[in-house]
Amino acid sequence: MSIYQSIQDFISLALQNGTIEPLDELYHRNQLLHFLGLNDWAEVDKEVHETNSLILMDQLLAIANENNVIAKGQDEFYEAALMNFMTPRPSKINHDFWEKYQASPDAATQYFYELAQQVNQVKTRDIARNIAFSHLTKYGKLEITINLSKPEKDPKAIAAAKLVKASSYPACQLCLENEGFYGLGNKPARSNHRIIQVSINGEDWGFQYSPYAYFNEHSILLNAKHQPMEINKRAFDNLLGFLDKFPNYMIGSNADLPIVGGSILTHDHYQAGRHDFPMAKAELRETIELAHFPEVSCGIVNWPMSVLRLASENQVELSKAADDFLKKWQVYSDESLQIKAKSTDGTPHHTITPIARIRDGKYELDLVLRDNNTNEKYPDGIFHPHPALHHIKKENIGLIEVMGLAILPARLETELLEVERYLLNQDNQMNEIHKAWAEQLKNEEHFTRETVHATVQGAVGEVFEEVLKDAGVFKDTQEGHEGFRKFIDFVNQ
């Protein structure tokens, strides 16, 4: 296919998705020719030959490279700017989204998600590189991923970034100002990034899809203002308010304290999507009567972390009950279990990771109790993956992992292959950090070429289960169960 046919097909897709109108076609073509380093044109078939936007993107990037129009280390920025030629303006997308919303929230999100994939805002090819498997436990089937989707920085890009003058704009990667931002140094390319403006409880928010999604239709609800995250009654109201607008999605928030929180605490945001997480499938271990909230049902979830599940048709009462649990947890201590609400200087250590969904006609809130205390034995966190597990997972346990989906580092792709070679007594370059674990596996089982891969994956799943147990404040033991009931009694006073 000729370069001009590729360009024409690219323009045809832009016409089809509403980026341009027929009267814009010549103008759009000329702008694109200049962008690709071309100054000529040959008439081609108007019938579309290639409908895959990513294949066309590759073809046009090859043209740009041949014409030397992409500066060293600028590939990511140029690629996003190229796809911006196929991405409707924010006003057009918002108009179409809310028009489709009149039919159903599902129609609106489907439109936006499909468009985000077409224009490479959601990087489907990178996401497809992730390694995924599951592991069955007594709590249900845990989901494990080795995250390979975020590409390693090219050395030229790293060198170029060092030469860029520091900028405070946008203030962070979650600010609305990222929409259409070309990119700069270590600030990602967002030329083709689009955000839906939405009002939740009278506040302005932005709704976008995550470029490197960790689960189906992984989306982010971000505050229009750059302000810190905070778990409080307003947060519960926001989660439930989002469900009123998008009942087809679940939504949750990272905790708002270091160690137990996510990687971005400086910008108020939540994460949503269409995925039935393992924790959502978990049954209740026991039910609880709430003395002060008769309209709210409650139970302890059968899960390695400490989770309360609240449900009600009454959104107002549900939010009040969640807030009551939060406030009581923020002052509750049980030092026999190393649970301590505050330091002597008043530093808070207790918060909640909340998750909201609609199930069987009721609003549901899962409240995961978090404690970020440290001590001499566990300087990274008492309720954080303990050192023996750091060879697999040492990062914070955030919202997604709390719900039973492990996001493991890319290094494990090659490191686990070396572990397999070690277990088969083959020449290997196994990282020393896996030695004790691999020795233990070797002593427990005989390995063959046919069984080693699945067995190592199962062992990784067991490590993730232990990670979640470490993060649980009330352990799944008789002592832990008794401690949990004492806390419930405190709440019911």
From Swiss-Prot:
Keywords: Carbohydrate metabolism, Cytoplasm, Galactose metabolism, Nucleotidyltransferase, Transferase. It is found in: Cytoplasm. GO terms for cellular component: cytoplasm. Signal peptide: none annotated. GO terms for molecular function: UDP-glucose:hexose-1-phosphate uridylyltransferase activity. It holds the Pfam family GalP_UDP_transf. Pathway: Carbohydrate metabolism; galactose metabolism. GO terms for biological process: galactose metabolic process. Its EC number is 2.7.7.12. It catalyses: alpha-D-galactose 1-phosphate + UDP-alpha-D-glucose = alpha-D-glucose 1-phosphate + UDP-alpha-D-galactose. It comes from the Bacteria. It is an enzyme of class 2 (transferase). InterPro entries: GalP_uridyl_Trfase_II, GalP_uridyl_Trfase_II_CS, GalP_Utransf_C, GalP_Utransf_N. Its main location: cytoplasm. Belongs to the galactose-1-phosphate uridylyltransferase type 2 family. PANTHER family: DUF4922 DOMAIN-CONTAINING PROTEIN, GALACTOSE-1-PHOSPHATE URIDYLYLTRANSFERASE. This is Galactose-1-phosphate uridylyltransferase.
